[in-house]
Amino acid sequence: MQVISSKDNELIKHIRKLKEKKERDASNEYLVEGIKIVKEAIQENAKIKQIILCDDCEKTESIPKDLMYEIAKHICIYVTSKLFKYISEVQEPQGVLAVIEKNNGDKTIDYTQDIIVALDDVQDPGNLGTILRTVDSVGVNQILVSKGTADSYNPKVVRSTMGAIFRVKIIECEDLKKTLKEIKKHKFKIVVSSLQTENTIYDINYYKKVIIIGNEANGVEQQIQEMADEKIKIPMLRKNRKLKCICS
C-alpha cells in the first residue's frame, strides 16, 4: 500500500485548494469529510472521484468494516496521519474524506413538484445548509439559488446539509428574475418572505408555488417582491432575524 506523506503531492495540493470556491468551480468538484457523510455519498451514488484515507484507519478500526468494504470499491488514496490533519477541515478528523463531482449538470426544473424553493442572495452558509436539509426532509428535490447566494459546495454548507446535498438538485440561476418569469408560465405562483404581512407559512395553499427566501439582512429583492402573488412571514433564527426556513 502506497502512502502519500508529502504536502507537495499534486493531489494534496488540489484537495487543499478545493476549500476555495475558485478551485471548486474550475474542477467541478467538492469535498465531503467524515464517516457518516462519506457513507451517505456512497449510498446515494454520488459521483465519487477519490476517497482519501488516513493510513492507520485499518489498524485502529476507526471506520466500520462494512463501510471499508464499500469504500474499497472506489479509488482509494492513503495518506499519513499528519498529512490527513493537514488537509482536514475539522479539529478531530475521522480519517476519511471524499472528492466528489458536483451534481449541477442538469439545470432542468421539475414542474411536477408542488413546491419549488428559490433563494435570493442567502449569505450565511449555515442557513443555506439548514434550508437544503429542511427542503430534503419534506420531499422537495430541487432548489434554485441566485448568483449572489452562498456557494452550495462550501465545506460548512456541505456539513450542515447532513447528506441532503446528494439528494437535492441545486440549480444555479444566472438571472433569478428571468428564471421566475419562466416558471410563472407553468402556472406557478410566487410567494415571497416578508415582514410586511400578517400571513404566515400556515396560511397558504402550497399547490404550484415558488417560495422565495431572501437575504438575511435585506430580504427579497424589490423587483422580485413586485412579481409576488402572495407574501408570508417566516420563522426566524434567534433574535437577529436570520432566516431559518419556511418549509414544514
Per-region residue spans from a language model:
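Post-transcriptional modification and biogenesis factors for structured RNAs
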Residues: 1-247
